[in-house]
């Protein structure tokens, strides 16, 4: 199997990480991964909230 190197995996955005986990492990795992993405993908919590939380959009 062709597996991406760890170096390439670290360059993924938070959303790309969640999509990858969804494909690999399923929906529930991806949701749990998203909740702790600041630990798993080294993004800040603010970045994750901007990407994933529709409640955080103040324009609406």
UniProtKB/Swiss-Prot annotation:
Pfam (any one): CYSTM
Induction of its expression: Down-regulated in root tissues but up-regulated in shoot tissues in response to cadmium (CdCl(2)).
Keyword Secreted appears in the UniProt entry: yes
Places the protein is found: Cell membrane; Secreted, Cell wall
Tissues in which the protein is found: Mainly expressed in shoots, and, to a lower extent, in roots.
Keywords: Cell membrane, Cell wall, Membrane, Metal-binding, Secreted, Stress response, Transmembrane, Transmembrane helix
Any GO BP annotation: detoxification of copper ion
Major location (coarse): membrane
Sequence intervals crossing the membrane: 26-42
Assigned protein family: Belongs to the CYSTM1 family.
Protein name: Protein CADMIUM TOLERANCE 4
Organism of provenance: Oryza sativa subsp. japonica
């Amino acid at each position: 199997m062709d597996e991406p190197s760890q170096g390439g995996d670290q360059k993924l955005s938070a959303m790309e990480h969640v999509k990858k986990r969804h494909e690999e492990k399923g929906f529930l795992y991806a949701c749990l991964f998203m909740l702790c993405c600041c630990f798993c993908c080294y993004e800040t919590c603010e970045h994750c909230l901007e990407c994933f939380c529709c409640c955080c959009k103040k324009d609406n």
